[in-house]
Amino acid sequence: MSDRPHTPLLDQVTRPADLKRFSDAQLTQLAGELRAETVSAVSVTGGHLGAGLGVVELTVALHAVFDTPRDKVIWDVGHQCYPHKILTERRDRIRTLRMKDGLSGFTKRSESPYDPFGAAHSSTSISAALGFAVARDLGGVTPEGLGDAIAVIGDGSMSAGMAFEAMNNAGHLKKRLIVILNDNEMSIAPPVGALSNYLSRLYAEEPFQELKAAAKGAVSLLPEPFREGAKRAKEMLKGMAVGGTLFEELGFSYIGPIDGHDMGQLLPVLRTVKARATGPILLHVLTKKGKGYAPAERARDRGHATAKFDVVTGEQKKAPSNAPSYTAVFGKALVDQAARDDKIVAVTAAMPDGTGLNLFAERYPSRCFDVGIAEQHGVTFSAALAAGGLKPFCAMYSTFLQRGYDQVVHDVAIQRLPVRFAIDRAGLVGADGATHAGSFDIAYLANLPGMVVMAAADEAELVHMVATAAAHDDGPIAFRYPRGEGVGVEMPELGKVLEIGKGRMIQKGARVALLSFGTRLTEVQKAAEALAARGITPTIADARFAKPLDRDLILNLAHDHEALITIEEGAVGGFGSHVAQLLADEGVFDHGLKFRSMVLPDIFIDQSSPADMYAVAGMNAPQIEAKVLDVLGIGRIGEKRA
């Protein structure tokens, strides 16, 4: 007996075109079946549940009305795309979401023609849709053709400047472009800022029940340029016209808000937009994150991303923890430092829970700032906090900090302002794949004059690095740490301030030195144990700092060993490259040192478990062991010693 839901209509759907033969009542039933199938699939795989459940009706309506893949539906962020994937010839693989060799948890061009533009970071959809619209009008060609361009963007994503840059440009170009504002009053955390308040007022100004009834006759509601006599409709629904002023000033015709879970509203409005739209139009749709699944509705923030769970109870099936997560360790360590220094403040970009700053916000709400999905603003805001005499910790994922890189250079580094960058999700992150990998921050930060760059080898080291950053006032400082649990080391009661630019010796050996930067140290130690069985005892050191380098440690390792190997969870151009530059400048290579640098390969690694991803990268213990044997000219693993 199968525990999968009963889905008689969904079973008849192999591609979106099949939806066009269903009646509106059947499409409503189909939405219910699609919601049940989404819950069932995510219970097996884990993933982003709440966002997808909130757009089930919208997904069905879009594919029923428009002609995908000729019409380009572009999902902002892409984490809400699971129902879309089920309808677009991928239902048979939906229970491989976020797994090795499975479906991506986001939209991905290489996966399906129904994913015209990949995503995983926010606020890109309007720019992409505008690009497709211009390409269409200038005779561009794609295998599926070019029809309408539809961006579906959440209210949280609208807090990013990029979305408004795109809307401003679209209003100027006046191309036929459809933007659907999916307003669920929530991104990952509750939304913040003036725009959120504006949307809330817009919703409140028009009694929603009256709006629901009126929207049934959507053709008569549409503002200019869609219908003669629209002036009367605007008078009838004054809140719609007045409420949309912000978007209309940007050059968009505005419709809404309408109920995003009522097919009786969605279908006629979308059909009329498709039939009559000329220039850019914004359709404001109200939805509920987690809609239709009680556990997700009750805890919408936690419903954003879940582990595998029991469908009946919603209880997540998490393996017991052996050590605290790095994120939790950072959050607690920062709270401890803030208790001793009232100048410490914290900044995050819509990720208080993901970065561990929820702990800080609970204790010190007036000293914690969630700037929304606005990394550029967040970095410059932090810079000015530092210029004003405070001690800001700017906590962001490595992959998202990329969005604020110009601000890191221009507003922080050049002015030598003591912003403390807490860089979470460093290295390879697992199920979220290449879009969320923290591969590049070592390279893009360590090349900046005056920037201090640290990496924690374990959770205790992270506590010390938080303390070090808190004490550092001579310019910017960054420390990176991975997703997931620590390694189970004994934790200090309070962090100690590390000497800037000084590493530590872990184990003394001979012939080969392994210099680790970050949490690959654990794999290095495992490799050393395997090498010991072969009679090889490598020296092991933890660099702690990529900038400034511990010159004495590195030069001594080079002088005392036949070979030196660096290991880091980052791309080429990072720690190993800086070590190589030092060795070259000091003429060490002139005297025969064998040097190797183990870095992430020059590819984007698809989702899998972190261990599998590091195996692909060639950076697990067996591969480190093999590198040592190779550089020493000893037989490969598996070959017997002579």
From Swiss-Prot:
CDD domains: TPP_DXS (cd02007), TPP_PYR_DXS_TK_like (cd07033)
Cofactor note: Binds 1 Mg(2+) ion per subunit. Binds 1 thiamine pyrophosphate per subunit.
UniProt xrefs under Pfam families: DXP_synthase_N, Transket_pyr, Transketolase_C
Residues that, per the record, bind thiamine diphosphate: H79, A120, H121, S122, G156, S157, N184, Y293, E375
Associated pathway: Metabolic intermediate biosynthesis; 1-deoxy-D-xylulose 5-phosphate biosynthesis; 1-deoxy-D-xylulose 5-phosphate from D-glyceraldehyde 3-phosphate and pyruvate: step 1/1
Keyword Magnesium among UniProt keywords: yes
Cofactor(s), names only, from the UniProt record: Mg(2+); thiamine diphosphate
GO biological process, one term: thiamine biosynthetic process
Quaternary structure note: Homodimer.
Protein's name according to its UniProt entry: 1-deoxy-D-xylulose-5-phosphate synthase
Organism: Ruegeria pomeroyi (strain ATCC 700808 / DSM 15171 / DSS-3)
